[in-house]
A protein has these predicted regions:
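Contiguous mid-protein beta-loop-alpha structural module that forms a pocket-lining wall or clamp
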Residues: 154, 161-214
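C-terminal amphipathic alpha-helical interaction region
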Residues: 308, 316, 320-368
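Substrate-recognition/cap regions that form aromatic- and gly/pro-loop-enriched pockets
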Residues: 253-262, 267-307, 311-317
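Conserved CoA-thioester-binding segment of acyl-CoA-metabolizing enzymes
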Residues: 1-57, 97, 366-368
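Glycine- (often His-adjacent) and acidic-residue-rich active-site loop
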Residues: 58-94, 146-148, 351
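Amphipathic alpha-helical blocks and their helix-capping loop/short-beta junctions
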Residues: 193-275
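Glycine-rich beta-to-alpha active-site loop
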Residues: 99-147, 169-179, 190
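Hydrophobic/aromatic residues within transmembrane alpha-helices
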Residues: 56, 69, 121-122, 181-182, ...
Length: 368
């Protein structure tokens, strides 16, 4: 199968399916045609015995994928096209689940920006027996609380399985992490230098492979150690666990703002300032999301994400967040609840109300 649209190129070579993201001006932000093209390819390759593995990558150095097409979703909502928004997220989450349950190694090469929807089309690789490769340029994040959203695309399932309170910390703050952090947190599996990726892809297209496991082993032989590069998350782990292990956003803030003196004080002050810039409602929704994901399947996680997405557009902060951060860029969002301390438990629980009967949920058929 070979398919080309302006935003993506899909081809096969030497028993491997290749998906190249090609929307560089938008940092490969996912459009509906891109979602559909990737899903069609996976459906075609799933039961094709001549395809042993899948590699998804970006030929552009700045970004693997910066997320979903947020401007498109904002414009659709402003136009009252709510069905378009729901269709986009439903299609995206179906794709995330198809990757998570793909029966062959799925390999993601994660250079540059890897955020939001980019995490959704890459994190499932580990579950398939594949590998997530990060590089020196990797900038990984789920920054959704900055725009009044939450860490969707099933990523709460992965964040809930990171060491200690790292998942809650990343979900609430939207902090950007590098390759060393991603490896420490279990959000990546191997490291390669950026300038080694083009040669790796060329070799994968030329070298014959008999099995998917053979493809993975070959990639692992090309990976290298980060050597003495330390993970900031690892160094800050004690602080993170102390302040983010339990409680809502207000409790985390109170804990951070109670610190006085020393190295922890500087870190706590920076982190508290970051939290104060986020949507208070989204922070609490995101912390709750990680807690719930700990005991959920991926299918349950994605069904929950879809309900939350509708709630955030209906009565959450996402429209104001996108306006302030991305459209007008005044960086002065007026959140529905101004202070973290004023978010009520009822407001958080309301966001989790399921708008569908169980059998009518658009993702009812998903099963891990």
């Amino acid at each position: 199968m070979t398919e080309s649209i302006d935003e993506i190129r899909i081809e096969r070579a030497q028993g491997i399916g290749f998906i190249a993201l090609n929307r560089p001006k938008a940092l490969n932000a996912l459009s509906t045609p891109m979602l559909h093209a990737i899903h069609r390819a996976l459906n075609a390759w799933r039961d094709d015995a001549s395809v042993h593995a899948v590699v998804i990558y970006s030929p552009h150095p700045r970004a693997f994928c910066a997320g979903g097409d947020i401007r498109f979703l904002y414009q659709s909502a402003k136009a009252g096209e709510h069905a378009v928004i729901e269709e986009f997220f439903t299609d995206e989450y179906r794709l995330n689940h198809a990757i998570f349950t793909f029966p062959k190694p799925y390999i993601a090469l994660l250079n540059g920006v890897v955020m939001g929807g980019g995490m959704g089309i890459s994190q499932g690789a580990r579950h398939t027996g594949g590998v997530r490769v990060v590089t020196g340029s990797t900038k990984m994040a789920m920054p959704e609380t900055r725009i009044g959203l939450f860490p969707d695309v099933g990523v709460s399932w992965f964040l809930a399985r990171t060491p200690g309170a790292i998942g809650r910390y990343l979900a609430a703050t939207g902090a950007t992490i590098d390759a060393a952090d991603a490896l420490y947190a279990g959000l990546a599996d191997a490291y390669m230098d950026d300038d080694a990726l083009p040669a790796l892809i060329d070799t994968l297209k030329e070298k014959p492979f008999a099995t998917g496991a053979e493809v993975v082993r070959f990639i692992e032989t090309q990976a290298r150690s980060l050597g003495g590069t330390a993970s900031e998350l690892e160094k800050e782990r004690g602080f993170i666990d102390k302040h983010f292990a339990t409680g809502n956003g207000a409790a985390c803030l109170k804990s951070l703002e109670s610190v006085t003196g020393g190295e922890e004080s500087d870190w706590a002050a920076r982190t508290a300032a970051e939290l104060r810039e986020r949507s208070p409602l989204s922070v609490d929704v995101s912390l709750e999301l990680i807690d719930r994901a700990k005991s959920s399947s991926m299918a349950e996680t994605l069904r929950r994400d879809l309900g939350l997405t509708r709630a955030t557009f209906d009565h959450g902060d996402v429209m104001e967040g996108i306006r302030a951060r991305i459209v007008d860029k005044d960086n002065q969002p007026v959140w529905k609840v101004a202070r973290m301390e004023d978010v009520t438990r009822d407001a958080v629980v309301r966001m989790y109300d399921n708008p569908w009967a169980e059998r009518d949920h658009p993702l009812a058929a998903l099963a891990d």
